[in-house]
Amino acid sequence: MSSIEKPCSASCERNREPILAVLTEYFPGDRRVLEIGSGTGHHAVHFAAAMPQWQWQCSDRAENLAGIHSWLEEAALPNAPEPIELDVASGNWPDDRYDAVFSANTLHIMGWEEVQALFLGLPNVLEHDARVVIYGPFNDDGRFSSDSNAQFDQLLRGRASQMGIRDQAAVDALAQRAGLQLIASVPMPANNRCLIWQRIR
């Protein structure tokens, strides 16, 4: 795949710097990072280039791997290996363990059963003191944080009934069952947030 065919994401271009600021705070030092749902691969290249001490492992469903590969091939970063196939619903988690997990704009695309499968599988790939950062829009006790998020949720559910903005408390309940403790909820531009968990067991 040539560089002309690289998949692009305008939202990644807009949010990559605010997200990087959060990651550099909560992923200090050398980290082996697993990105779940790497999408285009845009974030991976930007973050791996900015933080060479991180080993950034992309993952996604099989149909997205070629696009991710095109970004990684062009960037040729020594700390960003080939993407691996990961479909959380199928349970094909990698055998490796990671110090950190990152995922952006995935929970509202996944069905709720897939979100549950994600957190059920996380302990299998997390080191004992790992951190997890998930970026995206979230509700609070069923309430939308903005009119634009309510409109976005309606758009998502129009595309597929299983999609939709998730409630932070419901997601955190899954995280707690996976042995994770919420240590921060960082407001982000465009009515998004970064939720940060620490593995405690």
What are these regions (language model features)?
Residues 1-29:
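Class I SAM-dependent methyltransferase Rossmann-like catalytic core
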Residues 34, 42-91:
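Class I SAM-dependent methyltransferase SAM/SAH-binding core
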Residues 39:
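Conserved glycine-rich SAM-binding loop
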Residues 93-101:
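A short acidic, Gly/Pro-enriched loop at the edge of an enzyme's catalytic core
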Residues 110-122:
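A short, conserved alpha-helix within the catalytic core of class I
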Residues 129-141:
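Conserved beta-strand signature within the Rossmann-like core of class I S-adenosyl-L-methionine
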Residues 162-179:
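Short alpha-helix
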Residues 180-201:
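Core SAM-dependent methyltransferase catalytic element
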